[in-house]
Amino acid sequence: TQGVSSAASDVYKRQMKVGAGGLINSITIAGTVAVVTASVSHYGIEALAGYGLGSRLEIIITPLVFGIGSVLTAAVGINAGANQMSRAKKIAWVGAIISFIIIGVISIAVAVFPELWLDNFETNILSEKYAILYLIIVGPFYCFFAAGQTLYFASQGTGKIFFPVIVGIIRFLTVSVVCYLTITFSWSLSHIFYAVSFGLAITGIGLSLCMLGPDWNSEIN
């Protein structure tokens, strides 16, 4: 009975560790969106509306990434639990590449032909101009975010998400600093959109680098 209780306690601690990390990661994502939205609002209602139109593309991206990522969490977890880290790593990479390609095709198509997306909404000329600017600057980088989030879900399967969460914090801080500087020095709105793009790239590249770390190259204890 004591052995069963100890095992149950260990499982609970592992779940709480992953859950706490996931909570922090969600806060950094929501915080980034809040900071960007507040910063864009300084440029007027039309700019805010344009940003809203462009950023709603994430509504399509998020479920697709979750669909792939949730499968990876289970697949990686099974293999990591069996100490088949090489196989788990391969599964994670395949999932990330699939996400990168699928979202890359969608986001680049929208960046090149923004009317494909914007024609689904009623817009005025000024807000549409800002939306097009956002899609051109940020659109091509959604594939990095998709791949990064897919690898984040895969990392949950290993039970070790410290470094992935750090990547999310770095993204939040980077975007926040650039937004602050943009507002303080009255830079153009495009600087905020470039900050968003850089943040998406941080997610993809950062989570990819995490795959090279010890969490993916050692046995699960």
Stretch-by-stretch model annotation:
Residues 50-114, 145-167:
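Small-residue-rich hydrophobic transmembrane alpha-helices
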Residues 105-128, 132:
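Short membrane-interface helical motifs at transmembrane helix boundaries
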Residues 1-8, 12:
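Single conserved hydrophobic/aromatic residue that forms the stacking wall/gate
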Residues 129, 172-205, 209-220:
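Membrane-interface helix-loop junctions in multi-pass transport and translocation proteins
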Residues 14, 18-26, 38, 59, ...:
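Residue-level signature of transmembrane alpha-helical cores of multipass secondary-active transporters
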Residues 27-60, 78-79, 116-125:
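Helix-terminus/linker motif at the lipid-water interface of multi-pass membrane proteins
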Residues 42-45, 82, 157-158, 186:
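Helix-loop interface residues and adjacent transmembrane-helix termini in multi-pass membrane transporters
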Residues 125-151, 177:
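Alpha-helical transmembrane segments of multi-pass membrane proteins
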